């Protein structure tokens, strides 16, 4: 029996589970694939699947139908928000535009004939081009309007080569001066004017990555001329000389407006023009206007798509930095726990006294007296003996 008690005590003293060993520094836990950032190469490879991809995932016809439905819903929602007075004014403006277009088509010859002498006197005036140059220059400052009209007048009065040279030089100079003024003396007004415009907020992010390229795209977008000058001035990463360079690089787009003006001048100056020539001029005007609007719209869509793509990349980079910081903090915490375990295992107390009486332990030394040799049985025997003695 004592031997059985000793073996049982030794068995109970054994640990139930193996001791944890400190993690090896060579072992690294591999992160799951979903936690990794998408590289730029993979993103470009899968760009067609992105909602902001420049490549259409549907047919051109479906895109046109979708755009038409979107415009219809927007028109209906806007119309429902108008008050009765606003609806009456909107209907009146639409009717007035139809009447003006009809009058222009009917009396176009008389209108152009009355404008022809005026254009001729302006063209023959000494220094007359400076008036047009000044008009284009002033139209660059916010919130003035009329920039497109001045370009068309340049083509109407001076034709394609000379008219383009006048408005191109005035555009570059006016844009630069408007940029500097919007960043200095007009800064508070500009921030109130365009500071909360979502279009320009989206374009601000792209300038951090694409530089002169995105500046050229902004200049090609069909945005209000004076407002775009003011908005770009609020972007701190844009240098004035870079902005002037981008404006100069996109001045060839002015040929479209100048060409339309020159065709109008031809219709006004030649009274004996036959029907076929007039038809060609009108077709040229319509094609030029449609081409300019289409190019501007496509560039605007691609610019905004690029802005959304860069915004997603910025968010991914920020989320990746946060995840990396949390992972490093977790690894640091695990390392501290491992060091503490090692210190506890190797801890040697300098105050141990082998002669002192130790406390309770589950381990039994065979050399020591068997603690179960005398115990409850002897005590019960003694009690039983005393009982018998008392009974006798």
From Swiss-Prot:
Membrane-crossing residue ranges in chain numbering: 88-108, 127-147, 164-186, 241-261, 279-299
Glycosylation sites: 46
Ranges of the Lumenal topological domain: 1-87, 148-163, 262-278
Subcellular location: Golgi apparatus membrane
Cytoplasmic side: 109-126, 187-240, 300-392
GO annotation terms (biological process): mitotic spindle elongation; vesicle-mediated transport
Chain intervals for the UniProt region annotation (VTT domain): 155-264
Membrane topology term: Multi-pass membrane protein
Region (Disordered): 14-37
Keyword terms: Glycoprotein, Golgi apparatus, Membrane, Transmembrane, Transmembrane helix
Single GO cellular component term: Golgi membrane
Pfam families linked: VTT_dom (PF09335)
Domain notes from UniProt: The VTT domain was previously called the SNARE-assoc domain. As there is no evidence that this domain associates with SNARE proteins, it was renamed as VMP1, TMEM41, and TVP38 (VTT) domain.
Primary role: Golgi membrane protein involved in vesicular trafficking and spindle migration.
PANTHER family noted in UniProt: GOLGI APPARATUS MEMBRANE PROTEIN TVP38, GOLGI APPARATUS MEMBRANE PROTEIN TVP38-RELATED
Homology family: Belongs to the TVP38/TMEM64 family.
Protein name, entry field: Golgi apparatus membrane protein tvp38
Organism annotation: Botryotinia fuckeliana (strain B05.10)
């Amino acid at each position: 029996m004592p031997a059985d008690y000793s073996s049982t005590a030794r068995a109970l003293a054994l640990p139930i589970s193996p001791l944890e060993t400190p993690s090896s520094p060579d072992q690294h836990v591999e992160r799951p694939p979903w936690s990794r950032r998408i590289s730029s190469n993979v993103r470009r490879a899968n760009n067609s699947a992105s909602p902001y991809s420049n490549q259409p995932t549907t047919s051109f016809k479906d895109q046109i139908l979708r755009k038409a439905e979107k415009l219809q819903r927007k028109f209906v929602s806007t119309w429902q928000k108008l008050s009765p007075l606003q609806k009456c004014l909107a209907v009146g403006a639409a009717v007035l535009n139809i009447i003006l277009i009809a009058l222009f088509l009917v009396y176009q010859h008389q209108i152009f004939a009355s404008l022809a002498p005026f254009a001729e006197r302006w063209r023959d005036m000494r220094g007359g081009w400076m008036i047009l140059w000044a008009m284009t220059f002033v139209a660059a400052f916010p919130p003035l309007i009329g920039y497109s009209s001045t370009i068309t007048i340049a083509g109407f009065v001076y034709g394609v080569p000379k008219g383009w040279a006048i408005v191109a030089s005035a555009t570059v100079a006016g844009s630069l001066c408007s940029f500097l003024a919007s960043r200095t003396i007009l800064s508070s007004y500009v921030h109130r004017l365009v500071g909360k415009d979502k279009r320009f907020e989206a374009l601000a992010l792209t300038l951090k990555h694409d530089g002169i390229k995105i500046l050229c795209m902004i200049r090609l977008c069909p945005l209000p001329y004076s407002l775009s000058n003011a908005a770009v001035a609020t972007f701190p990463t844009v240098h004035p000389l870079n902005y002037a360079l981008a404006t100069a690089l996109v001045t060839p787009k002015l040929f479209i407006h100048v060409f339309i003006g020159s065709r109008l001048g031809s219709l006004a100056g030649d009274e004996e023009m036959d029907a076929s020539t007039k038809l060609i001029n009108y077709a040229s005007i319509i094609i030029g206007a449609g081409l300019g609007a289409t190019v501007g719209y496509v560039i605007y869509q691609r610019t905004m798509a690029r802005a959304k793509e860069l915004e997603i990349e910025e968010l991914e980079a920020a989320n990746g930095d946060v995840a990396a910081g949390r992972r490093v903090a977790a690894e640091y915490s695990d390392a501290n726990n491992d060091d503490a375990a090692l210190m506890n295992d190797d801890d040697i107390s300098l105050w141990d006294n082998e002669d002192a009486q130790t406390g309770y332990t589950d381990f039994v030394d065979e050399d020591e007296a068997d603690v179960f040799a005398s115990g409850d049985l002897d005590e019960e025997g003694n009690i039983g003996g005393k009982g018998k003695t008392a009974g006798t």
